[in-house]
Every structure is written in structure tokens, then in C-alpha cells.
């Protein structure tokens, strides 16, 4: 070994001796295996209970009408029902067959041809797609009102007027009965005057009074409530009706009633003014009247001459009637200052149309008031209005 190699070896040894002694290597203990973490239980979503079933729909009551008697008023009541959207389910008339009913309803010499569709199908009268059962029973007790749903019955024959006579409709299934004439004992109502007195719990049969009472009573109500009526006389100049003769013939009631309707002005009796006392009790015994039957087919006029409790100028009377016609009696009482004549009121639906220019006053206490009415069409519309009102009051 050379001297140089010895030196290098010694240096290397010295260097090795000077290095720190390495720490003994400690083997790390193995970590214990990770314990599985408990998984949170899944949140159970609460399922809401099913909604309750919807309540059963309330059965909507529907007004249905039956008509007994298909004469002037019966046919016009059907027209009024069609115009007002009232459902007619049956017509009874023993003297008119189905085909003739179609003809009579379609054509009218006074009010013109019916503007809708009229036909018959499968034994029914069909008006504007409304199917109407037709019966030909001679007695009210025979009419099967139950079979068509127990309607409100319009008694339009002019024959059955009393409670005893018309209760047969109820026994046959009618729900209520409205008599299209004054009745000797049935409660009497005039729309716009006393309909609020109707009691559905005790009144199944009522009277719609007469066409003349329907004209006079609204007028008398306005005047009496504002100015007071001490006493009065009424005259109605009335168109001829089906009960009169086209030529002279026999009459049991009064001889001159049998004279030709087209040829004469015929004085006649009327209970219309006295009947006002039944619908306005405060006027009982204060009004009476008479009629002149004249040669016109339709539209009549009332002349009420009365003594007032409160001195009142005629202008104030006009103002009171005009206000009522625009307010609480709209559709029933009307007001005009036009130069009108009877044919201007053909097919007018009002009960009473006050003619402001035709009336006169002797002084502030004594006046003559004039009011027109279509004794057929206006009256028939009030019949339907009374039926609708009664239905609205029934529970």
C-alpha cells in the first residue's frame, strides 16, 4: 500500500468517525383499521294523507212550470217563459191537439209570429229545442204533474178559480199554483205592490189578480203613499176578450154583454178597483169602478179619478210617478210624455204605463190619472214574474 493510499484511508476513517450515529429506526406500529362510521338513517319523508274527497255538488234547484189551458193567456205565458229563460215542462189542454198547438203558438194575429222555432216531435211540443210534454186531461186531478217533476202550475183556463177547485193540481203533483184571474178566496198578489206578503209555508195556491188590477194597483200605491187617496172611481176602457160575442148572441150574465164586440162600446162590470183593497188594505172601501168594452183587440187604459188627502199640484204627481218608474217599480210601472195611442203599447211588458199628458186636475185635491196596459202581454209577464218570485222564496 502506498503512502498516499494510507493517508486517504485514514482520512476516510476519521470522517466516518466524526459522523453522528444514526438513530435507531423505530418501526411505527400499524394503525388500527378505521372503524366504519355508522351511517345516519335516511330521513323518511312523511307522505301526506290523501285529500278528502270533494263535497258532493249541491243539487241546484231548477224552476219548472206547467201550464193548464192554452188559450190567450196560456200561450202568452209560454212566450214570456221562453223570453225570461223559464223552463216549461208541460202544457195541458183537452180541446187542442198537438199539431194545432204548434200552429196556434206559432201564429198570433195580435202579437205577431213567434220568432223562434216551433214544432212537434214524438208527441211533444218543441219550442226552441225545449221539449214540452202535452196532456189532454179534462180535470185538474187527472193531469200527471208528478210525471214531469212537480212543476209550478199556471192555471190559465179561467174556469178553476177557488182554492177548492185548484187544490186538485196540488193533489196531482203540482208544487204551487198561480191562478191567472181574481179568486174568491185565494191570496192575491200584484207584483210591485204586495208580493212580499207571500208566505211559502202556508200559501200553495195564489192569485195574480186581474190585468186591470195589475195596472191600477201600482199607480194607486204610489199616489196613496205620497199624497193619500181619500176616495176614487176607476173606469177601464178595455179591449174585447174571448168571452164576448163576435155578433149579437145570448148572454146569461148581462144582456148587453152578448152584443157584438166589434160593433159596440159596451158598459160592463169589473171588480178590479175593489180588488185593490185586497192588495193595499188601506184602500179597502175607498175605490170602485166599471168598464167599457171597446172594439179593439188588445191594449186597455185605466182612468183613475180620485180625491187626494194632501193638496198636490199635478206636476208633483208626475214627478212622483216618474221617480217610482225609474226606481222601485222599474219594469212594472212606466212613464211617458209622448203623444201615444193604444197600439203603441202592443206587446208592452209593463203592468202600467202612466200617460202624463193625458191626465188632468180640477184642483190640487181632485185629479184624473191615465195609465195604459197591454191586458194580455203585460199581464202574462207578471204571471211569470210572480212564479219566479215564489220560487225564490221557497226553501
UniProtKB/Swiss-Prot annotation:
PROSITE patterns reported in the protein's UniProt record: GAPDH
Region of interest (Disordered), residue spans: 19-59
Keyword Oxidoreductase: yes
Compartments reported by the entry: Cytoplasm
Annotated pathway: Carbohydrate degradation; glycolysis; pyruvate from D-glyceraldehyde 3-phosphate: step 1/5
E.C. designation(s): 1.2.1.12
Biased composition (Pro residues): 31-41, 48-57
Positions marked as site (Activates thiol group during catalysis): 238
Keywords per UniProt: Cytoplasm, Glycolysis, NAD, Oxidoreductase
Catalytic activity as recorded in UniProt: D-glyceraldehyde 3-phosphate + phosphate + NAD(+) = (2R)-3-phospho-glyceroyl phosphate + NADH + H(+)
Any single GO BP term: glucose metabolic process
Residues involved in D-glyceraldehyde 3-phosphate binding: 210-212, 241, 270-271, 293
GO cellular component: cytosol
Broad class of where this protein is predominantly found: cytoplasm
Single Gene Ontology MF annotation: glyceraldehyde-3-phosphate dehydrogenase (NAD+) (phosphorylating) activity
Homology family: Belongs to the glyceraldehyde-3-phosphate dehydrogenase family.
Subunit structure, as described in the record: Homotetramer.
Record's comment describing the protein's domains: The testis-specific N-terminal extension mediates tight association with the cytoskeletal fibrous sheath of the spermatozoa flagellum, possibly via interchain disulfide-bonding of Cys-21 with sheath components.
Protein name: Glyceraldehyde-3-phosphate dehydrogenase, testis-specific
Lineage: Eukaryota, Metazoa, Chordata, Craniata, Vertebrata
